């Protein structure tokens, strides 16, 4: 009995201290307080993945721009000459990348709509032609940079030989003027040689009137006179068949014409002849597209580039004079048929040699 009373007393004491109701209430309070501070954590963990990626990318871009700005300021203060070259190189890469995207867009449009090259507008035709030429020049750098550690040698060669290895995007404004003058000096060296070849074939022309006209034209050019359009067009028959047709030109004559077009002359004569045909055909197609567009629609830079491509050193000639010369060229080019393209090829020499101050 005593033992049972003791047990009953202990249970009474513990029961009064911790009642079931108080225990349940305490558990509920803990659960509610846990929900109260745990809800925001669960909301943060369930943010949209797209928002997280967007915020991360924005942060990375901001930090990259800040670091890039500090790097540019450091180069500008401590290495000013290198900074100029670095800036030109980076801008050149951006322009080349923009050209590549535009060329791809044009090619995609041609493929979708089954458009041929000669059916394109003038600016798109010229862009593809120039981009193809730039890629061909860059291809050499890509090949020589393939061996391990050769890229260091490539950078050195690019610095030492910018005219030979780099395209126009990576030239300074002064380099552009100087290099264009150098290239024009190269092609002008072949002008007297081409005129002498024309004089040599005069006895082979059967028509006496054509012989006299060609002799008179060569004499005018040698004396420094700029020929008239009708003087050149009068010789169309001469350049459509023997001895001045594209397929009848002598090997040395073809090499001289290749140099006048700034094409390599160190290829077998059949390949040189094929390249000249292709190059002249492209220029003829460009001329037709330009005549349709109108010279007045071109910017000053586009006019000068078009004149330089066709043999005129436009870097030292005013815009109005360049437009006048380009109009003369188009008048001759658009009057020629495909069989008479040899005359258009020789027109690079005939029409540009004595125009204004180009004879030096």
From Swiss-Prot:
Cytoplasmic side: 1-137
Tissue: Kidney, liver, skeletal muscle, heart and brain. Overexpressed in various tumors including leukemia, lymphoma, and carcinomas of the breast, kidney, ovary, stomach, colon and uterine cervix.
GO biological processes: ATP biosynthetic process; gene expression; inflammatory response; mitochondrial calcium ion homeostasis; mitochondrion organization; non-canonical NF-kappaB signal transduction; phagocytosis; positive regulation of cold-induced thermogenesis
Annotated keywords: Membrane, Mitochondrion, Mitochondrion inner membrane, Mitochondrion outer membrane, Nucleus, Proto-oncogene, Transmembrane, Transmembrane helix
Annotated stretches, region: Required and sufficient for mitochondrial import: 1-110
A single GO molecular function term of this UniProt record: molecular adaptor activity
Record localization: Mitochondrion outer membrane; Nucleus; Mitochondrion inner membrane
Cell division keyword on record: no
GO annotations of cellular component type: mitochondrial inner membrane; mitochondrial outer membrane; mitochondrion; nucleolus; nucleoplasm; nucleus
Membrane topology: Single-pass membrane protein
Main location: mitochondrion
Residues of the Letm1 RBD domain: 186-360
Transmembrane region(s): 138-158
Stretches assigned to the Mitochondrial intermembrane side: 159-360
Subunit record text: Interacts with BRI3BP. Interacts (via C-terminal) with SMARCA4; the interaction regulates transcriptional expression of thermogenic genes in brown adipose tissue.
PANTHER family: LETM1 DOMAIN-CONTAINING PROTEIN 1 (PTHR14009:SF13), LEUCINE ZIPPER-EF-HAND CONTAINING TRANSMEMBRANE PROTEIN (PTHR14009)
Role summary: Plays an essential role for mitochondrial structure and function, as well as thermogenesis of brown adipocytes. In brown adipose tissue also localizes in the nucleus where it interacts with the chromatin remodeler SMARCA4 to regulate thermogenic genes expression, such as UCP1. May regulate phagocytosis and inflammatory responses to lipopolysaccharide in macrophages. Involved in tumorigenesis and may function as a negative regulator of the p53/TP53.
Name used for this protein in its record: LETM1 domain-containing protein 1
Organism (species): Homo sapiens (Human)
Lineage start: Eukaryota, Metazoa, Chordata, Craniata, Vertebrata
